[in-house]
Amino acid sequence: MEPELLVRKVSALQACVRGFLVRRQFQSLRAEYEAIVREVEGDLGTLQWTEGRIPRPRFLPEKAKSHQTWKAGDRVANPEQGLWNHFPCEESEGEATWEEMVLKKSGESSANQGSLCRDHSSWLQMKQNRKPSQEKTRDTTRMENPEATDQRLPHSQPQLQELQYHRSHLAMELLWLQQAINSRKEYLLLKQTLRSPEAGPIREEPRVFLEHGEQACERDQSQPSAPLEDQSYRDRTTGELEQEDDSCHRVKSPHRSPGSLATTQKNIAGAKCREPCYSKSGPPSSIPSNSQALGDRLTKGPDDGRQTFGGTCLLQMKILEDQTPRGLKPRNHCPRKSRTQLSALYEDSNIKEMSPRKLDHKEPDCRTVRTQELGLSEDHIIWDGTLGGPEHSVLDLWRTKPPKGQAPTDRSSRDGTSNEPSHEGQKKQRTIPWRSKSPEILSSTKAGCTGEEQWRGRPWKTEPPG
């Protein structure tokens, strides 16, 4: 009977060792699981383990979280408590087995009974020794984890963090708004400073013109109260510019109609004769001596002597050339803007009303003087444009003298004849053939645009008509 008893004792010892190892493994798994939950949730308030031989984790709602906080803290602080909690069950089982063995083997010796009593007493001593150790561990857990003792701390800590985050967010928003306001102010100040210096040159730009005719017209409009001397000086300059443009235009367009040439000559003569008209805007005592002398000479009739009147016009042209500065003389032969300004000036109704009627009767005399400068008669002169050679390329002019109050008409033929009536009663026009001249004289006439001065004083040969 001894081997059977030995086997039973060894099997009971092995069962106790296996149970101890299994419980130890379960405790390690529980500790790892709780560490993971603490890392994710922050605390173990919602975790609860079920009762039984094999405990299972269970998560509680937030309402029951505060009630289970203390229990969870105790369980975490005493991981060995569960191990010894299961020992009483095993002890009862062991006692039952030992009682059965005693009842079955009542005939055993007293030595075996004493050994069983010693084993039972050893289990009781182990229980008594572990009770004070459990109380010590509970005190230490309370000191180490004060958050677990207070039910309000788990709720207040996340709320405090949220409030701090919200405060930092509001501070960043206010800082951003302040920076945006400052940048907007700097932009507006910079824009205002950039606009202020540009206002001056922009207002003065309309007064700047490249062409001298436009510059004179703009100054006349912007300065209505200018001195009379400057105004008369601008009038003389305008007349000279028109005279040069007319001569250049005649050279560039040899096939121009006689009606347009007569209109151009009339405008030139009107510009010369209107110089005294501008003197009404100021006191009569400030009129220059040259303009006054010219007005006195123009009021005289053609009966006083054609040579004297022609010399007066030539003298006036020289005076204008001497008084005109070089900067005001146009370099281009026929500037378009100058002609546009001059034509607008001639068509102005105010200037026409200011001019006296006596000067309008003297405009044909000025044209007569222009024809006498070339040594021609007062009759209509027609230069034949059908001739070949350099004469046709340089000058092909038709000069007519329309009657007063009648607009010239453009009726010309290619063979060099004209049907316009003359000023003295539709006289028969004489055709004067152009004599060949030297190429040097023709080239100088075309380049300088002053053909009247080049041919002045040269004899003209006329042939009888027919």
UniProtKB/Swiss-Prot annotation:
User: Which stretches does UniProt call biased (Basic and acidic residues)?
Assistant: 132-153, 297-306
> Its domain of life?
Eukaryota
Which parts of this chain are annotated as the region Disordered?
A: 105-157, 214-233, 238-310, 394-466
Q: Where is the IQ domain?
A: 6-35
Which residue positions does Phosphoserine occur at? Answer: 438
Q: Which UniProt keywords apply?
A: Phosphoprotein
Keyword Zinc-finger assigned to the entry: answer is no
Tell me the protein's name: IQ domain-containing protein C
Keyword Cell inner membrane listed: no
What InterPro entries is this protein classified in? IQCC (IPR042506)
Q: Which PROSITE patterns does the protein's record reference?
A: IQ
Gene that encodes it: IQCC
Show the coiled coil region(s). Answer: none
Provide ranges: composition bias, Polar residues.
282-293
